[in-house]
Structures are given as C-alpha cells and as structure tokens.
Amino acid sequence: MVPELMFDEPRPGRPPRHLADLDAAGRASAVAELGLPAFRAKQLAHQYYGRLIADPRQMTDLPAAVRDRIAGAMFPNLLTASADITCDAGQTRKTLWRAVDGTMFESVLMRYPRRNTVCISSQAGCGMACPFCATGQGGLTRNLSTAEILEQVRAGAAALRDDFGDRLSNVVFMGMGEPLANYARVLAAVQRITARPPSGFGISARAVTVSTVGLAPAIRNLADARLGVTLALSLHAPDDGLRDTLVPVNNRWRISEALDAARYYANVTGRRVSIEYALIRDVNDQPWRADLLGKRLHRVLGPLAHVNLIPLNPTPGSDWDASPKPVEREFVKRVRAKGVSCTVRDTRGREISAACGQLAAVGG
C-alpha cells in the first residue's frame, strides 16, 4: 500500500506580514501605507538584510517616534527560539523554533573550517512519508511563509557574527519539509537569500542548495527560474521497485522522470546535480545497486552528477541502520568505477538528532 502523500498543507498558516515577505515594490507600498518617505523602504531592507537587525527599536537611523509603528506593521516577532542544543564542541547548533501560531520546526547551524552553513526548514513537518526519515514520518503541519524561512537564515547569520565573529557562507534547504512542495515561497526566499543588500543577504547562489525528493515538474520550473542554485535530488535507490518504498513520491514520478528533470536542470543552469543517497544496511547497499546507480547516472547526467552518500542516521522506531564501513567503501568504489563522482557526507549533529532525516521538532 502506497503511503498517502501530502502536497497540500492540512492547516494553512497565515503568519502576520513581515518585511521579509515583501519584494521591493511591496516594501515601498508598506512604507507608503505608514505615511513614511519612500527612502525608508530601502533603509529598512538594509537594516534587515545588511545589518541583520529585525527590531526597528534597534534601528538608530530611524526617528524614535516611528519605530514602534514600523515594528507593529512590518516586523512582527515571527519566531521564538524554544530550545538551542549544541554538539561537536559547539560547532553544531540545533534550534527549535516556535511560530506565532505555535507551529514548531527546526534549523541547524554548522561551522566548518572553511565554511559556515545553516540548514533550514521550508515546511513544518513533511508530507512525503519517507519511512527512514523522522520528519516524513511525522507528517505535514503547514508550509512556512517566506519570512519564516528567511528568519532562520538571518538568525543563523546573526549568531555567527555575534557568537563567533564569523560570516554565513552557505544555506541548504535540507531541514524539515519538501522545498518544492512550497515552491512559490521557497523561490522568493532563494531570491532574497542571493540578492545583494539591501535586497537580500548576498549569499552566492552557488552556495545555496535546494533539496527535493523528485517533484519533476517543479525541478523544471526551478531550472527555468535560472537562479543558479545547487539542486540536490534525494534518490536513495537506483531501481523503482525499492524507491517506491523508500521514497513514496516515486509512485508518481519514476526515477527516469526525476533524472530527466535533473538533466534539464543541469543543462539550463550548467550546474552539477548532487544525488543524495542514504546508505541503509542490507536495504539499498548491495554491490549491484551501486553498479546500477553509477550506470544510470553516467548515462543521464555524465560529469554533471555527484553522489553524496549519507550513512543512515538513527530515528525513533526504526530498525534500519547504517551500512558497515567496508560496504560503504565498496559502494563508493563501484559508483566511481562507472565514471561518476562519489563521496561520503561528513555527518554532523547525530547525537542531538540534528543530522539528515532526524529533525522532528519535539520538545520545547
């Protein structure tokens, strides 16, 4: 029996309007509604995206008399950090966020020697029902607004600056949710993540990754948007028989359709596609599956594919676990033998349930 997929949010969220929900025209209109001069729109955007300030009361270049009015109209307190948990000697931090309506979701901030990455959520929960993923097993609560997505980025960037004197370099849509099932808001968020201040955070498009389980039409739409971000396709099996179980959306868009869409993305953007593959002991780690994976990827994507192997992270109630290291090494060897780049991901945050597939927004 195919698990029920949820593409439509069961409880549509209507968080209050925030500056981060608005494009340049929207910001200008909001400022005009407040009876403020037009230049304030650019000034507010610079404070938010450039200086990472989300409270107008701290914006000293604004007249004191209008700060409260601007705060109420354009800077509602969308998210509250309900809990922060760290591991990896403080280099990994998971934040449990509570939205205005009580919805809970998570983001993860990771510091590396040469980069700093925030892993953000696009939905509260997920409707794709992948059996090895805690988020998917919890179901979908609702889509996040553009501002709720961007607030995770701003908070991560501000934490790096204030706590470590460092800068945010990478953003990955690999937290809770299927980003392409919340397409319009994710697209708007990506545009503002990559735009230069005062229109956005100024993160390089090449340092932004959007992950998907394989919503083929949306992958093509993302290609046509020509944002130039990295596409990560969560494949997890090279054959439809197994992928139907591991990634139930495969019952709607087969592997061939997902890979064809990925090839279209690579052709349009010139970007290499990352193929995500959670390696599960005795489930998808057989030598013949490594051979088939390499063969299919080489045929469709050639040098524009990179396999990112992920040792399966434990989740509550699951008997599955990661493949032994010798099996993992053999899998890598066989994929590479087919002419496809393949590496094993450096897993972070496993002990605080912050790693891939572990986010469940519990506690707090």
Curated annotation (Swiss-Prot):
An example Gene Ontology CC term for this record: peptidoglycan-based cell wall
Gene behind this protein: rlmN
GO biological process: rRNA base methylation; tRNA methylation
Disulfide cysteine pairs (residue numbers): C119-C356
Span of domain Radical SAM core: 112-350
GO terms of molecular function: 4 iron, 4 sulfur cluster binding; metal ion binding; rRNA (adenine(2503)-C2-)-methyltransferase activity; rRNA binding; tRNA (adenine(37)-C2)-methyltransferase activity; tRNA binding
Family: Belongs to the radical SAM superfamily. RlmN family.
Coiled coil stretches, renumbered: none
Note in the entry: Reaction proceeds by a ping-pong mechanism involving intermediate methylation of a conserved cysteine residue.
CC cofactor note: Binds 1 [4Fe-4S] cluster. The cluster is coordinated with 3 cysteines and an exchangeable S-adenosyl-L-methionine.
Subcellular location as annotated: Cytoplasm
Broad EC category: transferase
Keywords: 4Fe-4S, Cytoplasm, Disulfide bond, Iron, Iron-sulfur, Metal-binding, Methyltransferase, rRNA processing, S-adenosyl-L-methionine, Transferase, tRNA processing
InterPro entries attached to this UniProt entry: Aldolase_TIM, Methyltransferase_A, RNA_MTrfase_RlmN, rRNA_lsu_MTrfase_RlmN/Cfr, rSAM
NCBIfam families per UniProt: rRNA_mod_RlmN
Protein name: Probable dual-specificity RNA methyltransferase RlmN
Reactions the enzyme catalyzes: adenosine(2503) in 23S rRNA + 2 reduced [2Fe-2S]-[ferredoxin] + 2 S-adenosyl-L-methionine = 2-methyladenosine(2503) in 23S rRNA + 5'-deoxyadenosine + L-methionine + 2 oxidized [2Fe-2S]-[ferredoxin] + S-adenosyl-L-homocysteine; adenosine(37) in tRNA + 2 reduced [2Fe-2S]-[ferredoxin] + 2 S-adenosyl-L-methionine = 2-methyladenosine(37) in tRNA + 5'-deoxyadenosine + L-methionine + 2 oxidized [2Fe-2S]-[ferredoxin] + S-adenosyl-L-homocysteine
